[in-house]
Amino acid sequence: MTIIHNLGFPRIGAQRELKRAVEAYWAGRQTAEALHETGRALRAAHWQRQADAGVAFVPVGDFAWYDHILEWTTLLGAVPARFGHPEGKPVDLDTLFRMGRGRAPSGKPAAACEMTKWFDTNYHYIVPELTPGQTFRVAREDLFEQVKEAQALGHRVKPVIPGPLTWLWLGKGDAFAQGAGDIGKLQLLDALLPVYGEVLERLAGLGVEWVQIDEPALVLDLPQAWRDAYQAVYAKLAASPVKLLLATYFDGLKDNLATALALPVAGLHVDLVRAPDQLSDVASGLRPGQVLSAGVINGRNIWRTDLDAALAMLVPVREQLQERLWLAPSCSLLHVPVDLAGETELDAELLGWLSFAVQKLDELCLLGKALGGDADPAVQQGLAAQRAALQARRQSPRIHNPAVAQRMAGQAGVSRERAPFGQRIARQQSELRLPAFPTTTIGSFPQTAEIRALRRDWKSGALTDSAYENAIRKEIEEVIRFQEKVGLDVLVHGEPERNDMVEYFGELLAGFAFTKNGWVQSYGSRCVKPPIIFGDVARPAPMTVGWSAYAQSLTDKPVKGMLTGPVTILQWSFVRDDQPREATCRQLALALRDEVVDLEAAGIRVIQIDEPAIREGLPLRRADWRAYLDWAVDCFRLSTAGVGEATQIHTHMCYSEFNDIIESIAAMDADVITIETSRSNMELLKAFEDFHYPNDIGPGVYDIHSPNVPEVDWMVELMRKAAARLPKERLWVNPDCGLKTRAWPETEAALIGMVQAARTLRAA
């Protein structure tokens, strides 16, 4: 029998129960005990569903109230001093929430810990804060309590914990840089490893046989000092009485293969979706008795698996390893929606092409039975059904659009060039007449329950088109008047018609489909519902021109047209896997180019094309960066270069480290770039300073992910730090990101303060 297991299951719940419970607790609408009861119910349901699918060991430790890395950080007692946590006391839930979002029902508000992208995914983790001489201890009991929970329900368990070197790689501090470049972080291992040892001992004491220890850092470029550290660390952890399954994912081991194979662990998990070519080398390098966990079901996309291809790849290895070959998804299923059963509005054809977390476990079970030679006719029937679904998708006329193919054939001859920046900015300033330190926002304004109800009623047919349009126009006018009252210089229409910055555009583009309940966690309680790009992309009609033109008609101040860029739409969607991602991105760029040209023709003088996801698309290995950056930058320029020099092009990026891609950001040639910098205390600007970034820049002066209202003096100080690095005449003043998730009172207070900060700077 082939053992199948799972690296992690979506924690949010099929109906986003966790999001609702957590937000109700934050708002004081339910107690901590009620929140914990929701957590217990979700965990029990998730464990049972996995057990029903044939998972041999249910994962424990994949559940998190906010973020799984933050869970582990608090278990280690690594709480920054500003949160006022008493030394030696257990870390409570409200401290965890304050670290993640800056405030909680109890405890004083404090600056939240930094948040950034989880490798090359659209999930965000809370960055561990590291200090020289830091001490660690077991400071939370949740992991052990959840193990006992699962065991009491009759499950065999496999606790999942971040590996010590990956946790250090993810962390940073005033004295330590993020990543593997700072070997000084390795000095913390002496204090860290005894706590790992204690955790493993305690798990063994609970009867745990296997522990999954996640080390995705092993798929990255690592200095030799880090490779050496892996050997030393796991030599110490090998003394534990539990068996360690070391899990790598998101890419192949490549030049770290020898390091991984030399580690004294009982099993090794590898990603065979991203890196199938490594299978033979990994299998032949295993020690006698060592388990190979083959990640063959894609944990990051939603298409059905080609089980025939998987079997062809695995059969020779099965013959070699026998029962030592385990099967699993490529990575945690955190990155896909929970269950297709909730999709009652997708057509049957498209539904037959898809696989969410629950279905992926069923695929895994079927694959395991087929690989083990199960003679049950249902196995062959299941394989035949899978085969038929894949064939139907390949042959569907919905996939290919001849007009798109014709345009793609000629896209190489479409201009990507605009006039030089100096010439453009002079023309723009003569027309826009903006003051020094011009103020703006990133695009969205608070989405109230009333706005969400408007969209919901309109989509359900309860509201007529004309009634909906009138209501949205009213919302836009209120946002315009509010911005005028506050004193902002470049306005936005507030995006009341948009539920999501990607889904909105996908609904208006050909080649997209949308789920009813296909939610995945982005950060904390924030969930997103990625569109599905299943076929060729085209723009049947203008998407934003009507709303933007109406907003501009209400004011003499410039109103930004707001678009999501081609790379971000690509990155934040579930993308077809039957052609290169680059080709799909160029199709998106051509569609957006048409929209940009139409906005200019409608009198919109400032157009923002957001690309917050451009960095997350980077391959994990630096050797692969150039090819990606070349086509990503080219797609942005393809989408923006159809307008004249008087039209000002903005772009926005968030959660980004810019140092290593600053040349490519400059090559995008946006007139103004706005970035998230407040949580990093403006340290991101060093890249722009060192590079002598030539265009305008708006460093975010307050963190919109926290409900805390910033002090005016604090924002002034941040901008003075920015002005010390960059010419002040090229600086804009803006929040870190859009204001969609914030409430109106804090938004008004923050923007009034931000405008006051800009006026203080002008008067200096």
UniProtKB/Swiss-Prot annotation:
The active site is at residue 705. The keyword Transferase applies. It comes from the Bacteria. Its cofactor is Zn(2+). InterPro entries: Cbl-indep_Met_Synth_N (IPR013215), Cobalamin-indep_Met_synthase (IPR006276), Met_Synth_C/arc (IPR002629), UROD/MetE-like_sf (IPR038071). One of its GO terms (molecular function) is 5-methyltetrahydropteroyltriglutamate-homocysteine S-methyltransferase activity. Its EC number is 2.1.1.14. Binds 1 zinc ion per subunit. 5-methyltetrahydropteroyltri-L-glutamate binds at residues 16-19, 117, 526-527, 572, 616. It catalyses: 5-methyltetrahydropteroyltri-L-glutamate + L-homocysteine = tetrahydropteroyltri-L-glutamate + L-methionine. Pathway: Amino-acid biosynthesis; L-methionine biosynthesis via de novo pathway; L-methionine from L-homocysteine (MetE route): step 1/1. Gene3D superfamilies: 3.20.20.210. L-homocysteine binds at residues 442-444, 495, 610. Keywords: Amino-acid biosynthesis, Metal-binding, Methionine biosynthesis, Methyltransferase, Repeat, Transferase, Zinc. Catalyzes the transfer of a methyl group from 5-methyltetrahydrofolate to homocysteine resulting in methionine formation. Belongs to the vitamin-B12 independent methionine synthase family. This is 5-methyltetrahydropteroyltriglutamate--homocysteine methyltransferase. It comes from Bordetella pertussis (strain Tohama I / ATCC BAA-589 / NCTC 13251). The gene is metE.
